[in-house]
Amino acid sequence: MSLDTKKAQMRIMKVIEQVQLSDLINVADIGAASINETPVYSDLVMGGYGHLFAFDGDSRQIPALRKLYGDHATVLNHFLADGDPHTAYICREDTGMTSLLKPNQTALAFFNNFSLFGKVLKEERIQTTRLDDIDEIGDLHFVKMDVQGSELNILKNGLKKLSNCVAVQLEVSFICLYENQPGFGEIDMWMRSIGFAPHRFLDIKRWSITPTINGNNFRRPFNQLLEADIVYVRDPLNMKKRTSGQLKMLAFMSEAFFDSPDLTIHYLRELVSRKS
């Protein structure tokens, strides 16, 4: 274990003690293939303070996930959606573009190199599974999702498993790269309708527009928005509906995952008022 890893896990332990969190946090990462990112929950799971349910429908990603997390995760090779058969559009493994939605060629061509990233190698008829029908998992407390346009479909078919979920991290699109893909506005309205409020953007991705390239690097953007990772939390204006256990989880995540000390204190003040 590296020194940085030890420090990170000591910080996790300290925050758990500060908020007096006693419950194990169940995390679901749907579309869990690690494409150039370290998830916010990584130190929690690797330290043994939570359990990860890692989903990926692309079987090419499963061995790497099992190697990465070992006994800290239950790795499940499912395409989550509405439980019906769908066509999977299989793209190159390293692009993370494989989807249950057909790539929109006009949208791909708008951005430099995305026609290559979104090139479909083959189409495969697959059976999807509803999140609510996964017997291996119980209640989820934090959900991260990056599933190339299927986020809303999965959420709508997982409301039972999400009934005690306190925070959700979603990839949302400003320019939709797939046909019939819900955009940011549609997802935001639905999340609000089930009692979540937007808290912060963890990352906002911009991309250069074809054919203009910035500094001879097609990955260096100008200003065009492409997509973002947004965090939603249970409505912080309506804490009376939350149990003390849920508030402790929210306080922990706000500090350890989202780097939001003001939100942490907001929840802690409510807990103090309850003498919890």
Annotate each predicted stretch with a short phrase.
Residues 1-276:
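Phosphate/nucleotide-binding beta-alpha loop and adjacent structural elements of enzyme active sites
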